[in-house]
Amino acid sequence: MHDTILKSKVFLDHIAIESTNPKKIAEFYSKNLMMKKKCVSNIEWHCFGPNRLLIFKKGINNKLSCAAFGCKSERKLNKIRKRVLSEKIKIKEYSSIYLEKSSFSIYDPDNNKIVFGVPLKRWSKKNKYHAPLQHLTLQSLNVKKIIDFYHKKLGFAISDRVINENGVITTCFFRSNKEHHSLACFKAKNVGIDHHSYEVGKWKLIRDWCDYISKRGLTLFWGPGRHGPGNNLFVFFEDCDGNKIELSAELELIKNRKFLDWPHDARTLNLWGKSYLRV
């Protein structure tokens, strides 16, 4: 029962982010990440592409409205629900046009809303720029309490940790399937979203994506580089609200290994060069 999430092969299905101008940010993703946009109401826009779905709601810029994790059967979802209830975590039924009616939501120690459900079938036609939404990274004042919640209570597996010279965990990477992480958390001065990431597959596709967004006037603020934990290649850029977006390639696939501890230094975050340290 300890690795309930991992054994259920959970994946990040979609995220919802608040914005003072949902229409504007939806137009950004439609133009620059080749996602179709849909106006749901005057305060909510949806963007979707092959295996990537984002929801933008009227609110405070850069605030996570929710992160929705999917699994492929009601049986697996029921196991997760049972695990959550056994930990005495309060559950609320969750309604979404993208998930089966059995979906539910909970809140983590930083008051981030986390949803679990079985995704309904939707458009997933691949093209040259296939880039599924792959992981969400959070910021927290206290990474340990995030570990206690997601690992000990929910059953995400730990892939890697980053520890500073005082023995404090500054970063933790959680996996819910064979991919190195579908969720991570950095120790920071703020609480909320750090970044979200799309897995493009191969290194040459990062090149193609960078050429594509460059033609639209965007510039990278970090990368190209290679992370230590996960060993993936990456680039980062920002959307019109300042949300950080990662394009990743060749993320480590883990069959069965114990987590590794990495030092809190620049080379851990980028084996190739300059780093982006949160604290």
What are these regions (language model features)?
Residues 1-5, 11-20, 59-132, 137, 171-174, ...:
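Vicinal oxygen chelate
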Residues 53-55, 90-93, 159-160, 182-184, ...:
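A short linear hydrophobic-aromatic micro-motif
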Residues 33-66, 112-120, 161-194, 200-203, ...:
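Conserved short beta-strand elements that form part of the metal-binding/catalytic scaffold
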Residues 1-23, 64-69, 121-145, 157-159, ...:
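N-terminal beta-strand motif that seeds the catalytic metal site of vicinal oxygen chelate
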Residues 7-52, 98, 102, 138-181:
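Core segments of cupin and vicinal oxygen chelate
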